[in-house]
Amino acid sequence: MDNKPLITVAEASEYKELLALEKLPQSSQLSYKAIFKSVSSEWEQVKTDITHVNENILKDINEEIEQTDQIEKKLKSSFKSINQHYHKLLKHRRNRQNDEGTSDLFLKYKNDVNELASNIETIENGLDMVIQNMISFDSTSSLDGDSLFNSSIITKRHYPLLYDLIHKNYNKGQNSDKTSKDNSKITTDVTLPASDEDNSPDIEEQQSKLSSLSFSIEKAQNPIPVDKAKNTDNSSRSIINSNVKIKNPTLILPMIKQRAQPSVALDAKPVIARDSYKADTKSIIAPEIT
C-alpha cells in the first residue's frame, strides 16, 4: 500500500481560504448606532435624494393643479358661451315659431280688413242711396220753402246734423252764400196796433204761425228734457205769445216764405267726406231776433 505524505493544516488550501476571509467585527461594531454611523454618509445622501425627489414631485403636482385650474376656467368659459348660444338658439327658435304664427295672424287680419273694407264700401253706397232718396223725397214732398236742404234758419236749427251733412258734401247753388247771409236775421220786433181790425181771423192765424216760428227758434236754442217737455210746452208757448208783438203780420209771413226758398241744387252729385259725418252743433250760432 502506497503511503501518502502527511499534509498539515497550515499547508491545506482550505486554511488558506479561511485566512483570506475578513475578520469578524467586534460586537460593539454590530449595534444600530455603529451600523448607522458607518453608513451615515450614504444615509445623508439617501435623505437628500428623497427630499429632492419629493420637491420635484410636489412641483410637478402644483404645475398639474395650475394647469387643471386653467383648463377648468376655460371649460367654464366655454360652457358659459355654449349656454348663451343655446339660449339664443332657443330664443330664435321661439321667434321663428312666433313669426309663423304671426304670418297666419296677418293673413287672418288681411281677410278681416278686406271684409271690413267691403262692408264700409257697402255702407257708403247705402248712405249715398239714402241721401239721394232723401233729396228726391224732399224735392217732391216738401211744402213751400220748407225743405230740409235749404238755408232756412228753421231747418238749420231743427236738423243741424242733417243740414251740415248735406251742405258739407253737396254743391250749393250760385246764390247760396247770398241767401245764407240774407237769412241770418228774421225781423219780428214789430208792434200790433191796438185797433179792432186786428181781431180778424186772418190776422190771428198769421200771428199764431209767427208765434209758433218764434217758439221753434227758442226751443232749438234751449232744448227741453223729454220728461219736462210736456209740462213746459204750454207755458213756453204762452210766454212766447205774450212777448212777441206784431205790428203788421201780413208783411212778415211773405218775407219769411221768400227767404226760406231752397238754395241747394238737388241734382248735384254727392261727394261724401268720411270725416264730416258729425256736425259740431256748438258752431251753429242762433240768429239775432231784432
UniProtKB/Swiss-Prot annotation:
GO CC entries: cytoplasmic vesicle; vacuole
Keyword vocabulary terms for this entry: Coiled coil, Cytoplasm, Cytoplasmic vesicle, Transport, Vacuole
Residue runs in coiled coils: 54-130
Chief location category: cytoplasm
Subcellular location: Cytoplasmic vesicle; Vacuole; Cytoplasm
Residue ranges, compositional bias (Acidic residues): 195-205
Annotated region (Disordered), positions in chain: 173-211
Function field: Component of the biogenesis of lysosome-related organelles complex-1 (BLOC-1) involved in endosomal cargo sorting.
Family according to the record: Belongs to the VAB2 family.
Oligomeric and partner information: Component of the biogenesis of lysosome-related organelles complex-1 (BLOC-1) composed of at least BLI1, BLS1, CNL1, KXD1, SNN1 and VAB2.
Protein name listed in UniProt: Biogenesis of lysosome-related organelles complex 1 subunit VAB2
Organism of derivation: Candida glabrata (strain ATCC 2001 / BCRC 20586 / JCM 3761 / NBRC 0622 / NRRL Y-65 / CBS 138)
Gene (name only): VAB2
